[in-house]
Amino acid sequence: MARTKMASETVESKNRALVLEAFDTLFNKRDYASAERFWSPNYIQHSAHIPPGREGLFNLVRSVPETMRYENQLIVADGDYVIAHGRFTGMGRPAAWIAADILRFEDGVFAEHWDVLQDEATQEESKSGLPMFGDKFPR
């Protein structure tokens, strides 16, 4: 039992690290050639905001301002699934996007993706009185 748990934690640690590296490579560095190694050519996209496939995602990133940045707050893994809670800023929108990205791994690459995106609330908009990301409200 302990051996299985340790093996699972190793796979999950690796998957978390791969998601963070992939998101930095694509969204922050915009290194499309290097980013290809993280996304399957048969990548399945479930997002209502992103065209199908790996090229749909890459073309979307190409279309947004160079100032776009991704930062991660929390990342969890369970087997072949990783959920990343992050923020996309600098997209030329009135508010940053807070995202929960769900990725499924297959053969060491992203095979499938779902997301939930929401405009980041200001302190005045927050019913809970707490920020959606980090410990401070956006300015």
PLM regions with names:
Residues M1-R139:
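C-terminal and inter-domain tail/linker signature
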